[in-house]
């Protein structure tokens, strides 16, 4: 009887130790998992937070500089061979060559550009980006390289109907959502009262006017000049002469506080200006009249 009682007590003790051991193991595993999550969260937080001068090391370590773009002729577009080309495409590659990193390009939705930038999906917004006071609150800019303006595009058939801003009262207006074109419409005493049609890209603004969905299209002079007129898909469209909205400048947008990358990019731009490379690119893509370093 005593032997049975002792055996039972020993068995209970062994089971107790086993249960404690299991509980301890599970607890330790849970703690390890939680620690991993916190570490990962901290790591992600570090990756997505731009500290002063901190981004350049991140870019240098990965060896690539990702430019966020939309298709915007003559800045970034696909040629007849399906190759990405354009003024800013070549400009980006030239700057990256100076910096010793590989240029890469990521198409983005323009109205989500700040989200993409801060999430580090891209390292810069390099696509006809207009410098504004509002944008300066959310990103840092390189030196300006193009002086641009917003213009109004109409059908050639309506050239006698829309001759100045006052004559455009009541006409539906298309512009790329979140663009300088939309801002120009909102700032206009006349156009701000008209029906607004938002497009996902500037090239779609031309489609809206061509199809008759919108009577007016407000977009960058640079793109309008390159995309409409004889020999293009938009030979039936024209720029309204004398109506210029919101003079502006293009620059490269980078993460707020990223001073080291800005300094390096500006240094590379200065070299490209000094050796004539940037001016040659401007002339190649029909941008000599808006090239900032001559105008």
Residue locations for each model-derived region?
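Flexible hinge/capping segments at coil-to-helix
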Residues: 154-172
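Ligand-binding clefts/hinges and TM-proximal coupling segments of bilobed small-molecule sensing domains
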Residues: 46-54, 180-199, 235-240, 267-295
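Periplasmic-binding protein-like
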Residues: 147-154, 221-222, 229-267, 288-295
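Bacterial lipoprotein signal-peptidase II cleavage site
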Residues: 5, 18-35, 40
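A ligand-binding cleft/hinge motif common to bilobed small-molecule-binding domains
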Residues: 112, 129-137, 184-187, 210-211, ...
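Short helices/loops that flank or line small-molecule/ion binding pockets
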Residues: 97-98, 106-107, 111-124, 138-140, ...
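Ligand-binding cleft/hinge of the Venus flytrap
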Residues: 77-81, 92-101, 180-200, 228-233
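Extracytoplasmic small-molecule ligand-binding "clamshell" domains
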Residues: 30-128
């Amino acid at each position: 009887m005593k032997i049975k009682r002792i055996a039972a007590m020993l068995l209970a003790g062994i089971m107790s130790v086993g249960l404690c051991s299991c509980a301890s193991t599970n607890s330790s595993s849970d703690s390890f998992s939680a620690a991993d999550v916190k570490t990962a969260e901290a790591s992600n937080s570090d990756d997505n937070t731009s500290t002063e001068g901190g981004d350049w090391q991140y870019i240098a370590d990965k060896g690539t500089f990702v430019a966020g773009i939309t298709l915007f002729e003559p800045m970034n577009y696909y040629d007849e061979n399906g190759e990405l080309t354009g003024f800013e495409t070549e400009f980006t590659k030239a700057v990256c060559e100076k910096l010793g990193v590989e240029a890469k390009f990521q198409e983005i939705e323009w109205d989500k550009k700040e989200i993409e930038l801060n999430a580090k999906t891209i390292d810069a917004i390099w696509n006809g980006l207009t410098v504004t006071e509002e944008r300066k609150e959310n990103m840092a800019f390189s030196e300006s390289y193009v002086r641009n303006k917003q213009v109004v595009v109409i059908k050639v058939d309506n050239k006698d109907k829309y001759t100045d801003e006052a004559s455009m009262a009541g006409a539906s207006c298309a512009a790329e959502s979140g663009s300088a074109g939309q801002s120009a419409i909102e700032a206009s005493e006349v156009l701000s009262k008209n029906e607004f049609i938002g497009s996902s890209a500037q090239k779609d603004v031309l489609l809206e006017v061509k199809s008759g969905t919108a009577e007016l299209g407000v977009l960058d002079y640079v793109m309008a000049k390159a995309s409409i007129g004889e020999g293009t898909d938009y030979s039936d469209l024209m720029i309204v002469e004398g109506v210029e909205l919101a003079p502006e400048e293009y620059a490269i947008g980078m993460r707020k506080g990223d001073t080291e990358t800005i300094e390096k990019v500006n240094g590379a731009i200065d070299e490209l200006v000094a050796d004539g490379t940037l001016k040659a690119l401007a002339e190649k893509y029909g941008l000599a009249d808006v090239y900032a370093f001559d105008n």
